[in-house]
Regions:
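Alpha-helical transmembrane segments
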Residues: 45-62
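Cytosolic-side membrane-entry/anchor segment at the start of a transmembrane helix
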Residues: 1-24, 81-83, 148
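Alpha-helical transmembrane segments and their immediate juxtamembrane interface regions
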Residues: 122-149
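Alpha-helical transmembrane segments and their membrane-interface junctions
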Residues: 100-122
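Alpha-helical transmembrane segments of multi-pass membrane proteins
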Residues: 22-33, 66-67, 131
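Membrane-interface helix termini and inter-helical loops of multi-pass transporters
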Residues: 33-45
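Membrane-helix interface/capping segments
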Residues: 63-87
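Short, amphipathic, aromatic/basic-enriched membrane-interface segments that mark the entry/exit
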Residues: 85-96
């Protein structure tokens, strides 16, 4: 069984790597390593529309899934041994980070490569929720305390 501190440390490393990777994509477009509007001229209007809708749908579906899915899965695990709760917390936290990473990177890509301004708002939402989901010992302790009740 991993200790609580080791779990939090591992989750924080994954969180920081995901956040930095999303920032690298952002900087690649901002600094001109990848051309802005790269696909805007080459894709059809139908493809452009599908990408715009996909951006909004990913944001609207994955952010609540990352937030509510995390808490509901841990609520359902009440009464389990502490080792199982720790494993579930680690697994769900990684899934949460990954889902938000998908939202952020896809939104950045659609904003810069296609020029869809709505993707900017989706990306900002994704970054905001990524900051909200920073793994802390306090949250883990709260779930462990709730499990003991």
């Amino acid at each position: 069984m991993m200790e609580k501190r080791a779990i939090i440390k591992s989750l924080r490393i994954n969180y920081v790597v995901s956040f930095v990777a999303a920032l690298v994509v952002l900087l690649a477009f901002e600094l001109g390593f990848i051309e802005k509007g790269l696909l805007a001229k080459t894709v059809s209007s139908t493809t452009l529309y599908v990408m715009q809708v996909a951006t909004v749908l990913l944001t609207v579906s994955l952010i609540p899934l990352a937030i509510k899915g995390f808490t509901s899965s841990l609520e359902k695990a009440k009464g389990q041994p502490e080792a199982d709760i720790l494993k579930l917390f680690c697994k769900r936290s990684l899934q949460r980070i990954f889902l938000l990473f998908i939202v952020v990177v896809f939104s950045e890509f659609v904003y810069y490569a296609l020029g869809y301004e709505g993707a900017l708002y989706c990306g900002v939402l994704g970054y905001g929720f990524m900051i909200y989901c920073f793994p802390t010992e306090m949250v883990l302790d709260q779930y462990l305390a709730d499990n003991k009740e």
